[in-house]
UniProtKB/Swiss-Prot annotation:
Compartments reported by the entry: Nucleus
Protein name as it appears in the record: Homeobox protein Hox-A9
Alphabetical keyword list: Developmental protein, DNA-binding, Homeobox, Nucleus, Transcription, Transcription regulation
Gene Ontology terms describing biological process: anterior/posterior pattern specification; DNA-templated transcription; embryonic skeletal system morphogenesis; proximal/distal pattern formation
Pfam families: Homeodomain, Hox9_act
Signal peptide as annotated in the record: none
Record region (Disordered): 159-192
Gene Ontology CC: one annotated term: nucleus
InterPro entries per record: Abd-B_homeobox_TF (IPR050803), HD (IPR001356), HD_metazoa (IPR020479), Homeobox_CS (IPR017970), Homeodomain-like_sf (IPR009057), Hox9_activation_N (IPR006711), HXA9/HXB9/HXC9 (IPR017112)
Ion transport recorded as keyword: no
Organism per entry: Morone saxatilis
DNA-binding region: 202-261
Amino acid sequence: MSTSGTLTSYYVDSLILPESEELSVPRYPSGPGLQHARQSASISDHSELGTCTFPSKPPVFGPSWSHVPAQFPGTVSSVYHHHYGHPQGPVGADTDGRYQSWLLEPMSGSLPMAGLPTTHHYGIKPEGLGTRADGALPGSHTALLLSDYANGTVATASPVEKDTLSGQAGDVSGEAEEKPGLDPSKSLQNNPVSNWLHASATRKKRCPYTKHQILELEKEFLFNTYLTRDRRYEVARLLNLTERQVKIWFQNRRMKMKKFNKDGAPKDE
């Protein structure tokens, strides 16, 4: 009995003790030794696959940007502003440790930067209005100075120039008076707007038949008042006429005969 009792207590203790140990000790210890063992085991398990190598990629950005001078040459536009953000250089390039202020300062010059998309207007060099005045009024010497144009003042013409301009205007009016007056009827006929009032008829001019042609047609009409198509073709070929001309002549000749029969014989007879 004592032997069996000790065995039962041993088995009971062996069954109960692991549960109590599980409560006090964490189920998955995370010691460095265990992690190293797991890593070595995983490496040994997949050692037959080999290592993976990736090609090196080029850097996204190029080398560092060079220092941009604060003052640009005079060929750069003073009113150009790109619609994209301006890249800023490295902070260390400035001796004072502050950002460059040339991005916010206006640049000198009046020429546009070619090759860059923009919708801004550029400064245009104002033309001297003297060339336009010379083209409009030949012989005049009036011109606007660029300084006067910028200040908003206009130079007035001298009395001599006024006399010259008035003389030119008088010559132009005299030439207009010397021209002979146009006939109003001819001017209306030449005017394309009123041309339809005097338009000629669209019909072709009447081409009279020769005596020989009329004689032959009269002979044919005495024999046949109506012509067949074949006979009309033969008559037209013999008289050097078209079939339409022969047909129209026979129609007119029949109408004339009907009118003569309707009116009756002349009273003189």
